[in-house]
Amino acid sequence: MINYNFRNRTSFPEDFLKKANVIKQIQNRFYTYGYDQIETPLFEDYDMYSNVQGTVQQDDMVKVIHSSGRVLVLRPDVTIPITRQYVETDMTSHYQRFSYCLDIFRFNETQQAYRTQAGVEFFGDESPEADAEVIALAIDSLKDLKIAPFKIEIGHSGIYKELLEQANLTDQEQQTLHALIQSKNISETSSFLDHLSIDQDLKQKIELIPMLYGDPSTVIKRAQAIVTNETMQQVVDTLFNVYSLLKDDQIEEYISFNLGLINNMNYYSGIIFQGFTEQIGQPILMGGRYDHLSSQFENEIPAVGFAFEIDKLLTLITPGDQPLITQADFLIEYQPNCRQDALLLARRLRQANKKVIIQPTESSSKIKASNIILVDSNSYQLKSSDIQTTFSSIDQTLQHVLKKR
């Protein structure tokens, strides 16, 4: 029996603020690239996902029964509903850039049943410039978060697909070969291919796939050696053009190629990429080109995108990379006979959109605040990291603290 992980995630204030800050930085970067934020429904018809091939496994979806008897699912994916909505509107005549930050829900034996993703979808443009744009956006977002070191591994499904067609393998043989190539198990791959009825030249080309990784220029040269038709040549040309654009953008230091990156081949139709850091053995972002997904909604439109795994990013954020987490902008403490003045000061600060906590001086509560104001019968004493001074009135106090900020 499989025990799925349904742990509740309660985000306490410091964790919530840390996550909110990461999301805000990512959303700000998405905005600077021209991506407009959208949202998809939390509940969707089960049929929409079950009828789309090569995407979400049916057993992974969290299903619920509507009072009408319809089977619904909690959102297991964002790209599919965005693609459907785009196809069903009149927006398909022009390029469209969307961004999102949403929770997705899937059964998983080892992870929580839901997680947060932030990503983008770029519809209508099949050019290498579009591929390079979303990769550059991913890189800039990671740089904003001061996550280092990291690498974006870029692959392409085209060459491997062409070799598979020539090999004419069964579904089971393809699955076995996929697993061996993705794990870069060279010896087992060779042994497995030896037992198949394929010619020696094709076998050698397939064996090269897991070794085509590393420096992009080197990988492109080595990939050229196994090109046998125009389709494969177009793949190499696409990789060359995308890398040239990334070099023009002066971000090639973050790029490596991996033509053994062949996951979700039924979903991705071209460029595939993943983001990795040394600290985590799993991708912190995944993306690629999925030009054929929209055809399952009866209108084929080129598209490329990616999504960050926010919860994985949070494990990489160090305290020094985040703003100081405090419980309040101002802590107002007051003597018993000065409560009215303290309440008035708190109200004025809150009207200026400041976060304020107020308590009597004898309170034992320990509050972390950027500024402390002690209100007694004759003065307002301000204590902050860079100043300690006394004012004679509320107006004088407000004039100083609000002007300063």
From Swiss-Prot:
HAMAP family: HisZ (MF_00125). InterPro entries: aa-tRNA-synth_II/BPL/LPL, HisRS-like_core, HisRS/HisZ, HisZ. One of its GO terms (biological process) is histidyl-tRNA aminoacylation. This is ATP phosphoribosyltransferase regulatory subunit. The gene is hisZ. Required for the first step of histidine biosynthesis. May allow the feedback regulation of ATP phosphoribosyltransferase activity by histidine. GO terms for molecular function: catalytic activity, acting on a protein; histidine-tRNA ligase activity; transferase activity. Keywords: Amino-acid biosynthesis, Cytoplasm, Histidine biosynthesis. Coiled coil: none annotated. It is found in: Cytoplasm. This function is generally fulfilled by the C-terminal part of HisG, which is missing in some bacteria such as this one. Heteromultimer composed of HisG and HisZ subunits. PANTHER family: ATP PHOSPHORIBOSYLTRANSFERASE REGULATORY SUBUNIT, HISTIDYL-TRNA SYNTHETASE. Belongs to the class-II aminoacyl-tRNA synthetase family. HisZ subfamily. One of its GO terms (cellular component) is cytoplasm. The keyword Cytoplasm applies. CDD domains: HisRS-like_core. Pathway: Amino-acid biosynthesis; L-histidine biosynthesis; L-histidine from 5-phospho-alpha-D-ribose 1-diphosphate: step 1/9. Pfam families: tRNA-synt_His (PF13393).
